[in-house]
Amino acid sequence: MQRAFPLLLFALAFSSLPAQEYTLTPDSQPQDGVPKGTVTKFVLPPGKYYPGTPHKCAVYVPAQYDATKPTPFMIFLDGSQALGNAMRVPVVFDNLIAKHDLPPMIAIFIDPGILPAVLDADQNRYNRIYEYDSLTPRFAEFLLNELIPEVEKSYNLSKNPDDRGLSGVSTGAVGAFMAAWNRPDQFHRVLSFIGTYVSMKGADALPALVRKTEPKPIRIFMQDGKQDHIVAAEPYGTNFSGSWPINNQVMYEALEFAGYDVKFEMGTGGHDLKQGGADLPDALRWLWRGYPEPIMVHEPAGTGQPGYDAADRVFSTIYVDKPWRQIGGAYGPIFSLTSDAEGNVYFADSRTNAIYRADADGNVTRFSEPPSDIPILRVGTDNRLYAYRPWKDEIVSSNIAADMGSDEKTVAHGLGDVVDFVVMRDGTIYSVNGQSGPRGGIIRIDPSGETHSALRWSDLGAESIMARNLALSPDQSMLIVSDANSHYSWSFQIAADRSLVNGEPFYRLEVPEATVRGFALGAAEDTNGQVYFATPLGIQIAMQNGRIMQILNPPLPGGGPLTAITFAGTANANWIYVAQDGKLFRRHVKVTGANAWTVVKPPKPTL
């Protein structure tokens, strides 16, 4: 109740002000002596992403276009509207390019798709909400793989993401923002007019996601009006999905919190383009200011100031100037990563059946060539490398100083389709199979090699669990089980007799919009008891209390899910390694990873 009163006052303030009169400036009027660009219309035929659905498009080309040079460009959603009198984009571009306020750039206009009805008596299917309101990467992939290549047939478009911008109005603002959010390797500039960041199809959740997620190199201009879906009798909003002014404000605050280069113009108008059209020239100047300087990620403006709360924020884990770096080459799918006390990382290449080692300096060399595929590796406290052999259904160990196969010992066999295992300091091993249903569960292997059924999913009434990874807490008192089948992962207490007890679906992960599954394919812990889950959204970092507090971006935007994760280092385990699309990446971090040979009691969690 304490927050409701201020928000009500906020809403009442919106409804009590008369709408300001907005007029187009000379920058939106044709000017004598200014070179005029050309606009060519075309229809993009149906393709893979929106089957059977054509899109009406147009391309503006400035008079200064030079076909020998890669040209910056912007894509305007609801393209016919952007071409119309409310925005007059070609006129604005002509004037700003002539003033050198914009570089010579192409504008691509695209309308939302309409699936034609089969019969005249039938209704068309209108795709605007499906395309623009979606949080999935589908629309971004459509732009990158269908629209842009079509325009590139005629024009030399830049591939530099700093040269690429997006603009959207209302629901189109969500589409523009999400295309850049999902593919920050492709788009760095966004115009958002009267954005629909409300509960239509999930955009109301974006501010929370923005606050948690490592910032991306995107510059955003936002505009809304205090009477956007607001009337005097309903200052809290007239639409079922929420309040446009409040949600735009919350979105802006989230972007500021995360450290984005963002500007927000809150006017007095409604859900229209009166202010947006008048603001467009200055918005474009702001969006492209400093060009061609690259758009970079920065820490939030309040960093280091008195009262600044740095705990639990992304930059308490990572360095702003130390991004992911690929090491080694291209391999087959990498299903596990493990490290030793010297900071070396080991992984198996499923394509060549070879085991590779990355040293502390990031140099990757072939370590050994076992006779067949070994997907899972773990380093134990006895300086031995443990491996699972699926063709024999056994775990073996070898001296880490020798090739796999020499000095080899069989640890256990008959384990049943193992997808991961962990080795404790006392030599106890927990292995998990990839089966769901009554056959799915965890096996405990004593140091003597004797095996025991430690847990069956059916014992928990959770037969849908599809475990993919195990991790130990830094004090080795808890076993974390990542579940690829839901957005929860489990925490089990390790009893004195090494049985697993008191299991709970403790960690609630964020999931990709296109699925209800979390697809957590890896997990690791730091010495503070925080869990790092490898997921399609990136590395989701859970506080010791179970909350997801940070999400680190994956190395390859638009790539496949992260398939493995580990910490490594020398004096401290201060590197984090992940595998994605058969490639190995690492980055320097501010935290220290937990390992099998050093047992550390984590601090009491925040409650």
Q: What spans do the regions from the language model cover?
A:
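Short loop/turn segments immediately following beta-strands, especially the blade-tip
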Residues: 399-403, 491-500, 588-597
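Beta-propeller domains
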Residues: 344-369
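Blade/loop signatures of beta-propeller domains
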Residues: 301-323, 500
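Blade-level signature of beta-propeller repeat domains, shared across WD40, Kelch, NHL, RCC1
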Residues: 563-607
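Beta-rich, blade/repeat-based domains predominating
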Residues: 329-344, 370-389, 413-441, 459-478, ...
